[in-house]
Curated annotation (Swiss-Prot):
Originating species: Rattus norvegicus (Rat)
Gene expressing this chain: Tmem17
Lineage, top ranks: Eukaryota, Metazoa, Chordata, Craniata, Vertebrata
InterPro entries the UniProt entry points to: Uncharacterised_TM-17
Subcellular location: Cell projection, Cilium membrane
Name of the molecule in the record: Transmembrane protein 17
One GO cellular component term noted in the UniProt record for this chain: MKS complex
An annotated GO BP: smoothened signaling pathway
């Protein structure tokens, strides 16, 4: 299951714009850019542990919500249930995109993971952690804090990994462009030499 082409293209363009190294004018090396793995082991380990921590977080959240449900005002009941449902849906998509983007070195998937983490998941989780009106219990503060640490680490490491991936893809593109240019100039020289011989 892959991202639709228009979404992939827009995420690729966004990634190139945000994470590309505009100061570089050419590839750094010819051989290293082709074979270097730029997947992030710390990011993958964090995603792995997060996939085991998330069910624990979800069960704890539901149990704590059940315990304090009668004390919460009606509007907070609706908000908390909506936020927990959103976090659950986003987390499934986010973990999938993070694993696929990191392991297969796909920039659009990893950029989607980074954007979901930074723009949706982190603000929702900070709302649950820092809102005083929710009357957070100590267990909730602990699990939300751990989840926030996971997310913060993943946002930072995904940013650094995306930067490396985009720079490597740019180097590959420049190498291919250089190879095509040198091949076409060699063909042009051969054509000129054969026409001169005639």
């Amino acid at each position: 299951m892959e991202l639709p082409d228009p979404v992939r293209q827009r995420l690729s363009n966004l990634s190139l714009t945000m994470f590309g190294d505009s100061s570089r004018t050419g590839p750094e090396s010819s051989e290293a850019a082709d074979n270097e793995m730029v997947s992030s082991l710390p990011l993958q380990m964090s995603l792995y542990f997060n996939s085991y921590f998330f069910p624990l977080w979800w069960v704890s959240c539901i149990v704590m919500l059940h315990l304090k449900y009668s004390v919460l005002p009606d509007y907070y009941k609706f908000i908390v249930i909506t936020v927990v449902i959103l976090i659950t849906l986003i987390e499934a998509i986010r973990l999938y995109l993070g694993c696929m983007g990191n392991l297969q070195e796909k920039v659009p998937e990893l950029a989607g993971f980074w954007l979901l983490s930074l723009l949706l998941q982190l603000p929702l989780l900070l709302f649950l952690l820092l809102n005083e009106g929710l009357k957070n219990l100590p267990l909730e503060k602990a699990i939300h804090s751990i989840f926030t640490v996971f997310l913060t680490f993943q946002v930072i490491s995904a940013f650094l990994t995306l930067k490396k991936m985009v720079n490597q893809l740019a180097a590959r593109f420049h190498l291919q462009d250089f190879d095509q240019l040198s091949a076409s100039s060699a063909t042009g020289r051969r054509a000129r030499q054969s026409s001169e011989e005639l």
